[in-house]
Amino acid sequence: MAQTLDDLIRTSELPVFIDFWADWCGPCKMVAPSVKQLASEFKGRLIVVKVNVDQQPDAAARFQVQGIPALMLFVGGQLKWRTAGAIPYQQMRQEVLKAIG
């Protein structure tokens, strides 16, 4: 998965938003509806990927995820924004808007 994720980030013409999460993570469950809303609002302008760190530990290690939820935004293959912990939808949306203009 890590290599596939790398390929997606590197080759995507659209910004890529990644949510690293786990089933047992309470804050991840709090953020999940916001991530879903983001995917819906920016459909066609943003790729949203959810990565379960328990099922894909190599991807979590590759992207140096130390706390979850970990949210990352890549544009043109470059990391533009990253945060760990639950944040409000409006903050996520603001970061995406900055990236996509």
Swiss-Prot record:
Keyword Disulfide bond carried by entry: yes
Disulfide cross-links: 25-28
GO molecular function annotations of the record: protein-disulfide reductase activity
Domain of life: Bacteria
SUPFAM superfamilies with a match to the protein in the record: Thioredoxin-like (SSF52833)
Pfam families, sorted: Thioredoxin (PF00085)
Keyword Disulfide bond in annotation: yes
Gene Ontology CC terms, in alphabetical order: cytoplasm
Keywords in alphabetical order: Disulfide bond, Electron transport, Redox-active center, Transport
Limits of the Thioredoxin domain: 2-101
Function: Participates in various redox reactions through the reversible oxidation of its active center dithiol to a disulfide and catalyzes dithiol-disulfide exchange reactions.
Entry similarity comment: Belongs to the thioredoxin family.
Protein known as: Thioredoxin 1
